[in-house]
Design a protein with these regions (language model features):
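Non-catalytic interfacial helical region
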Residues: 2-16, 28-31, 38-42, 47-127
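Pre-Walker A adenine-sensing motif
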Residues: 16-22
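Short, flexible turn/loop "capping" segments at secondary-structure junctions
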Residues: 24-26
Length: 129
């Protein structure tokens, strides 16, 4: 159900391992959640967001991006410090890398390689890329 990328290393977690990681707050900096079951993807997205930015989902520390977006928006969102909190999350829905040029793709991938400890990136897809 989920692929986590931690500083260039990847591991695939099933629901039990993901649930354990969330409970123990051992969440990777970059998380790719995918699946055909919309309910499960949403449930685990909500649990990751609860663990990183809290249940109130303060918009200051939750940055939402969808589809295509200015690459600078992603890099700035990842690099900026959380406000009035210890952590923040960047939620990317329906990322379509084919809509970006080569420089944009390279910038996105480089940004995901070096996510600061106070930031969690969650990439959502209803299908596995």
């Amino acid at each position: 159900m989920q692929l986590q990328i931690e500083r260039g290393n990847s591991m695939k977690l099933d629901e039990d391992k993901l649930s354990t990681a969330i409970k123990s707050r051992e969440i990777s900096r970059v998380n790719y959640l995918y699946g055909e079951e919309r309910f499960l993807v949403k449930t685990y997205t909500d649990r990751l967001l609860d663990a990183t930015v809290g249940k109130d989902r303060n918009d200051i520390n939750l940055i939402k991006l969808a589809g295509t977006f200015p690459v600078d928006t992603l890099t700035d969102s990842i690099d900026s410090m959380p406000l009035f909190a210890d952590s923040k999350a960047v939620l990317i829905s329906d990322l379509d890398l084919e809509k970006f040029d080569d420089n944009g793709i390279e910038t996105i991938l480089n940004s995901l390689k070096d996510v600061p400890d106070e930031c969690t990136v969650i990439i959502l897809s209803l299908i596995h890329i």
